[in-house]
Amino acid sequence: HFMIKEIHEQPKAVSDTLNSVIKDGMIDLSEVGLSEEEIKEISQIYIGACGSAYHVGVAAQYVMEDLVRIPVRVELASEFRYRNPILDPKGLVIIISQSGETADSLAALRESKKQGVKTLGIVNVIGSSIAREADNVFYTLAGPEIAVATTKAYSTQLIASYTLAIQFAKIRGQITEEQYTGYIEELKTIPDKISRIIEDKERLQWFASKQVNAKDIFFIGRGIDYAISLEGSLKMKEISYIHSEAYAAGELKHGTISLIEDGTLVIGVLTQPALYEKTLSNMVECKSRGAYLMGLTTFGHYNIEENADFSVYIPKTDPHFA
């Protein structure tokens, strides 16, 4: 029940996090601690995290590279800490953790500091170890999260990452003033869009009741949709105890598609217009092998119903933040 409660708290958590850094229509990172000069000097961004926070990092990598035009590497903190990483002294290491106490993430932070690289923690718990030890801190204002499976903390971590990407892009001259204002306005619409999605729960509950005996579930997507698929699959495992995997849709043909048989549930995530047709063709390929298809896309892409057995639509959003 805590999880249901926290799902419904997402709009407020996202809104609170945005309001903490958006002042008079502009992003203000003064409380985070990074100066404009420091942001201009960053040569590369490294992101370390575990679990759902790692999936945030995967999404952030796509957005930051596209907007900021800077190399971004995202890595599991549990791998990063043991492999003696080579870090650029002018790089920035971003560590994402809800609790701020995740052991592997904390170790990755300490390794980065040992190498003299600037660090930034995206954390939810004020005064936590990562918050204390990182050079800079972006607090997500999700409030206490009791459920084991993260919901509102995950959403606020995404928003924090997107906010950083927009501000970095502006400071480094990669986007115009008009784009900057547009992206900020787009972020401000997200809490209301989350509310609308949550209200549309009856169809999803009906669908879930029909699929309750599924043995294997595959989530597929491309680009940011792949990052979302990773999180969707983890949630499916954590909450339903049903075996689930996430794949970049283009990788299905390299062996995985042989696991799809009659009735296998395949959930396609298609929020990226430029990749929509590609992912749809992967879904059609799955259907030819007997898969039951669910499509998750934005309003307007109604042709998905020609192939998907069940479709879910979410409000249109700038593809970076979908």
Task: Place the predicted regions along the sequence by residue.
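Glycine-rich phosphate-binding loops that contact phosphosugars or nucleotide phosphates
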Residues: 40-189, 269-317
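Active-site phosphate/pyrophosphate-binding segments
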Residues: 10-14, 18-46, 136-265
